[in-house]
């Protein structure tokens, strides 16, 4: 741009200037150069006065630009094909890398053909294991044996969750009766893990047992079993969690947290659930760990 505010520099006669170091070449407009005008190419294409010129020199420039664009496209295609030929077929079948920030990005993805044996997970506290097992038992559908019993007309899912029933009885097989007659504590089918010794031993329905059509009687070998209350008491070093049996699998996780932790504020439970990514078991573990830390601070 000259002193008069025009972006064009008209070529004149040679002007004597002192010699200086050669600078980096600045791109110029070829069409303006054909017509004796020197103009910088940056931001000039839309405003070039000769952009619609159809003289022989400008037509030659157009053809040359088309040839250069075709050559660049061909070179890019050849470069992509050469890169694809270098990659083996085994690497092409692998999935792409996970997005940054994902928690699973830290663990390497094993190949789909080989499945190496994974090391056993570290042991967690007994209260966390008990809460996780109880939540899985309450939220997941029951196994086939329990589903066959639930299919009977005299014992429905609503009757299991209803506390107003007078008898609260349930029919069991001879195998369960033999296990119940043993002096050992009866193990829970869906909630027992070897790492959690404090898991409560409760049957599927949590009700009294009717043997040989007689009167219902509660089990004396399970101290944490209550026939009058439809709740599962989970006791551990961090406290006791009361889990109602009437929880259904279609309940939202926030409602389940409100039932398990009635003393906590709903807003706090919602924030913890969002922080755990909607995982109900992780949220219960966080709440139990916070409760254990608070009790330890009170003792000190």
Curated annotation (Swiss-Prot):
| DNA-binding region per UniProt | 29-76
Composition bias of kind Basic and acidic residues appears in 172-181
Specify residue ranges for compositional bias: Pro residues. 108-124
Gene3D superfamilies (UniProt xref) = DM DNA-binding domain
Write out the annotated subcellular location.
Nucleus
Specify the domain of life of the species encoding this protein. Answer: Eukaryota
Keyword Ion transport set for record: no
What processes does the entry annotate via GO biological process terms? adult locomotory behavior; regulation of DNA-templated transcription; sex differentiation; transmission of nerve impulse; ventral spinal cord interneuron specification
Q: Chief localization class? A: nucleus
Tissue expression as described in the entry: Expressed in the spinal cord, in a small population of neurons located in the ventral horn and around the central canal.
Please give the residue ranges the record annotates as the region Disordered.
Answer: 89-129, 157-226
Family, according to the entry, reads as follows: Belongs to the DMRT family.
Give the protein's recorded name. Answer: Doublesex and mab-3 related transcription factor 3, truncated
Report the domain remarks: DMA domain interacts with ubiquitin.
Instruction: Give the record's keywords alphabetically.
Output: Developmental protein, Differentiation, DNA-binding, Metal-binding, Nucleus, Sexual differentiation, Transcription, Transcription regulation, Zinc
Q: Which GO terms describe its cellular component?
A: nucleus
* Functional description taken from the UniProt entry: Probable transcription factor that plays a role in configuring the spinal circuits controlling stride in vertebrates. Involved in neuronal specification within a specific subdivision of spinal cord neurons and in the development of a coordinated locomotor network controlling limb movements. May regulate transcription during sexual development.
Remaining remarks = DMRT3 is a marker for a subset of spinal cord neurons (dI6).
| Domain DMA: start-end pairs | 251-286
- Gene Ontology terms, MF aspect: DNA binding; metal ion binding; sequence-specific DNA binding
| Pfam families in UniProt | DM (PF00751), DMA (PF03474)
* SMART domains the record matches: DM (SM00301)
PANTHER family recorded: DOUBLESEX AND MAB-3 RELATED TRANSCRIPTION FACTOR DMRT, DOUBLESEX- AND MAB-3-RELATED TRANSCRIPTION FACTOR 3
